[in-house]
Amino acid sequence: MLDSKGVSIDEYITLAKEHNAEIIQYRNKNADKEFIKEQLIYIRNIYDGFLIVNDAYELVEYCDGVHLGQEDLRAIDEDVHKAVMLVRSLVGEDKILGISTHNKEEVLDANRLDLNYIGLGAYRSTDTKKDITGILGDSIEDIAAESKHLVGAIGGVRLDDEFTHVTYNVIGSGLLK
């Protein structure tokens, strides 16, 4: 994501610090595991907050937790519950585990899972995801209220967006309170 915007990791970390991001997520769908590992080690050396890796749960020893999308979970096991149980057993209870959710049904399903948070959205369409179906808009509040987990609003969220039932605004993979 940063590459497509011409933003270096150093610039991104500087912005995350300026905006007091408590958690950042490293997401690179195109890189191999060794490259991701090197990037996680580098980020860990320059950022003191929580670092989450997207998808690459095998690399959790280099960060504080893992985030998985619905498709990524189903690639592990068609049964999302089994997939989360497997990933939780691999990453351990001391690591953060979160998943993406897109509607009330997925949020209610996530309530039965051993998670630390959910990402909920998309709130708006974004530059990278223009053709999203199911934009939540203002309904994000009602759906977020159904979650027993901390909620991060994802997809098209801006710094000035305010929500009652959302803990974090996820902006460019940085979670801001």
Where does each model-flagged region fall?
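Internal catalytic-core helix/loop-beta-alpha segment
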Residues: L90-G119, R124
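Glycine-rich phosphate-binding active-site loops on the catalytic face of alpha/beta enzymes
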Residues: M1, L68-V84, Y117-T133, G156-K177
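Conserved short-loop catalytic and cofactor-binding motifs
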Residues: R27-A31, G98, T128
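Alpha-helix-loop-beta-strand connector modules within alpha/beta enzyme cores
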Residues: K37-D55, D79-H102, D131-L159
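Catalytic cores of alpha/beta
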Residues: Y12, L51-L68, H102-N116, A145-L176
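N-terminal active-site wall of soluble small-molecule enzyme domains
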Residues: D10, K17, A21-L90
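Active-site mouth loops of central-metabolism enzymes
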Residues: M1-D10, K95-T101, R158, L176
